[in-house]
Amino acid sequence: MNTLATSLQTYFTTFARTQRDLSANTISSYRDTWRLLLKYLAATLMVPANAIDFDAVTAPNVTRFLDHLEHERGNSARTRNARLTAIRSVLSRAMPDHPEHAATITQVLAIPPKRTIRAVIEFLTPEEVTAVLAAPDPTTWTGRRDYALLAFTVQTGLRVSEVCSLTLNDVHLGTGATIACTGKGRRQRVTPLTRATVTVLATYLDERAARPGTALFCGPTGQPLSRDALEHRLAKHLSTATSNCSSLAVKHVTMHTLRHTAAMNLLAAGVDVSVIALWLGHADTHSTDAYLHADMSIKQAAIDRTRPLDVSPGTYKPNPDILAWLTAL
């Protein structure tokens, strides 16, 4: 076994799990990155994957691999950067043990991440939320479950992975009703529930008690719902909701859109960004600042506060009479 293979085994069996205590999702992502990289190098260098050592993991080869991911596999710049992070993590850990490869590793570590475009956050209006919540069939158990699931997510703003991992023990519907979850970076947080959400969950839990298992939102036989299952159920209800709310047709709505909607509702209610960051489980307010850019009402209010005293509030509207406008010009 060559030094690269040994370093990979040491990283994933000892360093990642024991010393860094990385999450299972992070370990899986890093593992998949190295599987892709080794397969790519084996194909391009025409050598067996087992024969690839540190001398093949050069900056030019890694850069070409990242380009391959983006241009041939169709990965986004964000995914490309995540793959680069995985490569860097393993090489950074290996460099002290293999100083003979320090020059090669240092050049790889110097590869810069690709700049990404942060799109404006998409969220649902109150009318669109109403249409989505009205879509599940209330005459079936799955319809009533889906209604509870969607209403719960819109209010709490939990990530889809957090919703999937919730158990019955995470719910407290007594005085000061809350939901406890473990989010990214295994940061634990407790989110308060509104009276309306408590009522919805209490009704759902009465029916949920007849099914086995501990998952909060489960299938008919008690099995936990997967991320794909949640997205599938939402897509099904969106097709129904769109017929009653045409604005949904031009939006790409996912479970994460419901999270964005919860954040925008808090922002519209005047909640401080730092509090919203805590609510969503963000490590800092940098990620939460994106919601400020998405809310046009905040920008309009800023314009109105800075307008001259003799100018009425609102945005500019051109004079529909073009001849009058030209005369006054």
Locate predicted features.
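Conserved catalytic core of the tyrosine transesterase superfamily
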Residues: M1-L329
